[in-house]
Amino acid sequence: MNPLLLAVDSGNTRVKWGLHDGRNWLMQGVAAQGDRVQLEREWRDLREPSRVVISNVANAGVKGSLSELLAQWKAEPQWITAVPYQCGVRNYYSNPAQLGSDRWAALVAAWVLERQGCLVVDAGTAMTVDALSDTGEFLGGLITPGLDLMQKILVEDLGSLESEGGKFCDYPDSTADALYSGAVHAMAGAIERMAALLAGTLGHMPECILSGGAAQQLQPQLNVNVKVMDNLVLQGLLAIARETSETASGGVVASPEDSIEN
């Protein structure tokens, strides 16, 4: 029986997880951040993993709660942090460790998948737009409010605005639609401006690897080549786990294709 890896992406609003047997994802799940009862229920009958790899960008309390849940298994959790170089990606952040572990894992996954310059976009609670060069250099990136947060900020600061039930329109004729459409345009504009900037650096138009809760809403509004990928962070955690495991054991690091395709 193949050893099992549990990968956990603990974000600001959701916890995503997947159990991998070295070839395929056997199970995947998602729970609202802080919903310990659901995670306990989903993990209660899970086959015991031999490794646990986690990206956590939530607070220390969340890390403590996850640690308590994971204590049911013998494997010591590996909490991922960004490093200067890993899996072919070079981190050019001025302070490499300051880069969020979720962004780092997503960059690793995108590089392993594409092996060329691309934009890596996670449209979650916040949206990140990160640039990869043709040689695997993380050049830098943007952070903006996400689709829901952008509208929430305006509603909270300008309390008379109504935001419920908004939808995207070419010419919005209600406040809710104007807020929603404005947020989509702002996010799409940030992505397209970064794509144009990166195209000038690379000499070719980069593909946009898009993930996150608002990916489906954004994709139709983008005038760039888009590839939507679910669970990009989990895929990056899988690649990182394989490299760190095989490097530690003195083995040959798994090929990029093997690390990402399943």
Swiss-Prot record:
Residues reported to bind substrate: 93, 100-103, 175
One GO term describing the cellular component: cytoplasm
GO BP annotations, alphabetical order: coenzyme A biosynthetic process
Active site positions, chain numbering: 102 (proton acceptor)
Signal sequence bounds: none
Primary site of residence: cytoplasm
EC numbers on record: 2.7.1.33
InterPro entries: ATPase_NBD (IPR043129), Type_III_PanK (IPR004619)
Broadest EC class assigned to this enzyme: transferase
Record-given protein name: Type III pantothenate kinase
KW RNA-binding (keyword) present: no
Required cofactor names: NH4(+); K(+)
Xref: PANTHER family: TYPE III PANTOTHENATE KINASE
Biological pathway: Cofactor biosynthesis; coenzyme A biosynthesis; CoA from (R)-pantothenate: step 1/5
GO MF term (any one): ATP binding
Location of the protein in the cell: Cytoplasm
Record: residues binding K(+): 122
Binding site for ATP: 9-16, 125
Keyword tags: ATP-binding, Coenzyme A biosynthesis, Cytoplasm, Kinase, Metal-binding, Nucleotide-binding, Potassium, Transferase
Catalyzed reaction equations: (R)-pantothenate + ATP = (R)-4'-phosphopantothenate + ADP + H(+)
